[in-house]
Amino acid sequence: SAKVMTLAQALGVLLGSAIGSSLTTQLIAFKITDFALVLIFSGACLFLFTKRSRRRSLGQILLGFGLIFYGMFVMSSAMAPIKDYPLVAAMIISLENYPFLAFLVALIVTAILQSSAGFLALLMTLAGQGLVGSYAMIPFVLGAHLGGTITGVLSSLGTPGRESKRAAWANFGFKLINGLLFLPLYRPSTTFVLWSSPDLSRQIANAHTIFSL
């Protein structure tokens, strides 16, 4: 809206941020959230107790990443008791048989969380508890991709310029077409992703990366 970038440049940034989000998911699959407090402590020490600007900048980066991963760790931990509620667990498991419904659930939850990586971190937690089947993975990932664009669309509505609106809606349209194109092909797509790793959390991260490219 500040007319600093053209529409093409803005779309490039949005598509690049999607790839960056997929890298965050890859790090979560590596269980880096277990080291979130270490990152926070290291970043805080570098920022508070050093005078060199480069070290302070590195401290800010580590602190930022640590807080992001700790937030995802807290959200994921909050989902852990779900397996103790049979009705809720059964509803989640049943979504494997209803790919379009799984797509919509992922879209809505991601829009609420305002983060596709955050939703997929929760999905990995549920997968670790055996509540997410392999064939629900692709619909969830596609829904998360589309849901992640909702924040940009809503934010653009309050901006005066047309370029920001066009960029946000173009990003939404691209992800919508991507979802509608691959959702009917979720079974062969799942078969392809299953080859990438024996671990379901890693498969989710790989699917997120593939559909972000």
Where are these regions (language model features)?
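Alpha-helical transmembrane segments of polytopic integral membrane proteins
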Residues: G16, G20, S42, I68, ...
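Interfacial loop-to-helix junctions that mark the boundaries of transmembrane helices
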Residues: Q26-F35, R55, A89-E96, Y135-M137, ...
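Helix-loop-helix hairpins and the membrane-proximal interhelical loops
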Residues: L62-I108, L126
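Hydrophobic core segments of alpha-helical transmembrane domains in multi-pass membrane transport
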Residues: I40-T50, G64-M75, V105-T110, N178-P184, ...
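Membrane-interfacial helix-loop connectors
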Residues: S1-S22, Q26-F35, F47, T110-G147, ...
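A structural-propensity feature for long, helix-poor, extended segments
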Residues: L27, K31-L63, S164-F172, L176-S189, ...
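Alpha-helical transmembrane segments of multi-pass membrane proteins, especially transporters
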Residues: A8-S17, I61-F69, S94, A106, ...
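Transmembrane alpha-helical segments and their short flanking loops
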Residues: M72, K83-L95, G158-L213
